[in-house]
Amino acid sequence: MFQDYLNDDTAEQWRWAGLYFDAKEYSQAADLLARVVERTPEQVGPRLLLARAYYHSAQLGRAEEQLREVIARDPVEQYAHLMLGRTLQRRGRPAEAARWLRLASALEGGGAPDA
C-alpha cells in the first residue's frame, strides 16, 4: 500500500494535500503533492493527484507532464489517459487529445467512441 512507502513527514504532507484538494485549494495541494512525488517517484497515486491539482489550477503544461509520466509508469491507468485527453483539449490540441480520449474509452471497456 502507498502509505507503507511514506515516512511520517511525507505521510503528513500526503494527508494535508488530500485535504487541500478536497477543499478545492488546488495550488496548495499541488505544492505538497510535488514534495510527496519527489520523495516517492515510483508511486502512481500521488503523481496522478498532482496532475489533477495542476489541471484544476490551470497549470496545464505541468499537468500534461505528470500525466505522461503516470502513463509511462502505468500504461493501463484509464483515468490518466482521460485526463491527458482533457488537458490537451484545454491546451488547444484537439487532434492529439482525441487519441488519448479513444484510449481512455477503450481501457474503460467502452470501445472507441465514434469520431
Label the predicted regions.
Residues 7-38:
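Alpha-helical segment of the N-proximal tetratricopeptide repeat
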Residues 78, 82, 86-112:
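TPR/TPR-like (Sel1-like) alpha-helical repeat modules
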Residues 37-38, 68-72, 105-106:
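Conserved structural position within tetratricopeptide repeats
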Residues 23-31, 57-69, 91-103:
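Structural signature of tandem alpha-helical TPR/SEL1-like repeats
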